Amino acid sequence: MLQPQETFSNPALRDEDKHLGNLWASKKSLYKNPAHLAQQQDPWSRLSSTPTATSRSRDTFFDSKIPKDDLDFRLATLYNHHTGAFKNKTEILLHQETIEDIQGTKIQFPGECFHAPSAPITSRTTIRHWINPKKESIHSIQGSIVSPHTAATNGGYSRKNDGGFFST
């Protein structure tokens, strides 16, 4: 009986080192130490053990100066009642982090002591505030999105005159 012939036969690889290059040389490790030992040496151990400002800010810690609600947020702003009277809301709600350039500075965490920060430099030229010269009426339908639904009904749906629901 005849043996069935393989239609997709793979030729046997002979002399792999001659045709494909030295396979064993390419599989050699390029590093002296295995990864689990190299991670315990500098610079990798220093990089993995030293937290960045972002990773430290994600850690759980208690700071009594953090605003707990909207009132505390507003009280923590840089507002002086003597010099800041009759300012508008955008000028009142300025926080120290907003107006200072803190790029590359280290964040102070509980238990760490740093020198006192310099006074913030505020310039009215850097604040851009636009006020619409024409007061728009809230009852005006001009510019509103046309829709058969009204918010006054339950679930935002209104009925047609014949009792059916609007559909899109």
Swiss-Prot record:
Location in or out of the cell: Cytoplasm, Cytoskeleton, Cilium axoneme; Cytoplasm, Cytoskeleton, Flagellum axoneme; Cytoplasm; Cytoplasm, Cytoskeleton
Region ranges (Disordered): 35-61, 149-168
The UniProt record lists the keyword Cytoplasm: yes
GO biological process, any: flagellated sperm motility
Polar residues bias locations: 38-55
InterPro entries (alphabetical): CFAP276
Keywords, comma-separated and alphabetical: Cell projection, Cilium, Cytoplasm, Cytoskeleton, Flagellum
Tissue occurrence: Predominantly expressed in nervous system tissues, such as the spinal cord, cerebrum, cerebellum, and sciatic nerve.
Main function: Microtubule inner protein (MIP) part of the dynein-decorated doublet microtubules (DMTs) in cilia axoneme, which is required for motile cilia beating. May play an important role for the maintenance of myelin-axon integrity. May affect intracellular Ca(2+) homeostasis.
Assembly, per entry: Microtubule inner protein component of sperm flagellar doublet microtubules.
Name this protein carries in UniProt: Cilia- and flagella-associated protein 276
Protein source organism: Mus musculus
Lineage of the organism: Eukaryota, Metazoa, Chordata, Craniata, Vertebrata
